Amino acid sequence: AGAGSGKTRVIIHRIAYLIFEKKISPYNILAITFTNKAASEMKSRLEKLIGVEGEKVWTSTFHSMCVRILRREIQNLDYSPDFVIYDTQDQLSVIKTILKERNLEEKKYPPKLILDRISNYKNQLIGAAESSKYALNYFDEVITDIYKDYQKKLFSFNGLDFDDLIMLMVRLFRENPEVLEKYQDRFKYILVDEYQDTNKAQYELVKMLA
């Protein structure tokens, strides 16, 4: 269904139905949206419709859900729970440092383009180590080498970028089935607003939780 066709309203009423008709605990319901604005709107509409029970439903964006879980569980991946989230400017400055270290010109290898390529890899759940398999030419190979350096640097700073949040959640669940099981037990019902917009990493994450 397209934008403005009332999908969010359907999700909110579905949650109310689960709580009041099916007697499902709001604690066992996860509602995911794509933007902070949509998440807070959903929260307030839920509370208006069902009162205090609405506060107990875990309503968040994909990324804020991942931050919440990773703060509790990321030591399983050898990061520390007080990890820093890098914004675009931080990411670009890491890329520029790597270009200098590798004596590569920014004109030939625009940092913004490199970031976009790294982001695409992560959204397809392609890690730095395996990215070189997908290189089609010399330019691609250089990008995958930069990707490897970039991940090493972020890891050494205990830093994550936005795409890491979802990619690392998938890795966390794959490598630690007992952690996945804990959240599968918690989230008996998962509702995703704008589900048609999910990329591969987001789709995989929802599939694992479900």
Regions found by a protein language model. Give the residues of each.
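Conserved helicase NTPase motor core
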Residues: 30-31, 38-39, 87, 137-210
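P-loop NTPase Walker
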Residues: 1-81, 85-86, 92, 157, ...
